């Protein structure tokens, strides 16, 4: 069983660094394509300020020169979902569960264990980077599929732009999750609820060592409970009354 989570734009580098590992060929090809951009070209590529683009330029060049600082991915990313994941004071069993079951999907690194070393970078599958004439999705599809081809159960906490990197055969094995709030009988869903709930849900998976869909259905976390009436066999819905 594998659990897939996305990367995040927000990062925290106020952490002890760890040793880097060599980039996969697919990752090196992406980095080589990114490294062709000047700082001013990155400004329009990323749609960010000149200051932010200069920072990203330095990050890319540091990776290219192999001088970049690396951090455990789970702690480097610091978006809303990540801030709601239990990342510290893990028991040995929780640490093992993380290492064996939780994987990050990255447009630079591929599908990698959640504690893998990563350097600060900005890249997702909505960005129009061409790698040897291919889109990022086409470039990564075979490697993404290879990582999961032996898995029978895949829990996806990804957004659709990450899920569609995988082939239909792999996507057919994915169990997806929706998190909603019930406000006086009105069911609401928005990105803040979803991101916080994904983090809390992953924490519940880790703490309860969940291995099956049946075990996931029984979870109560952060006020959310499973709603069978709203769910499909491979699309679980959890609702929180507010």
Swiss-Prot record:
GO cellular component: cytosol
Protein name stated in the entry: UPF0246 protein SPH_1662
PANTHER family: PEROXIDE STRESS RESISTANCE PROTEIN YAAA, PEROXIDE STRESS RESPONSE PROTEIN YAAA
Domain of life: Bacteria
Organism of origin: Streptococcus pneumoniae (strain Hungary19A-6)
Pfam families assigned to the protein according to its UniProt record, in alphabetical order: H2O2_YaaD
Family named by the database record: Belongs to the UPF0246 family.
GO BP, sorted A to Z: response to hydroperoxide
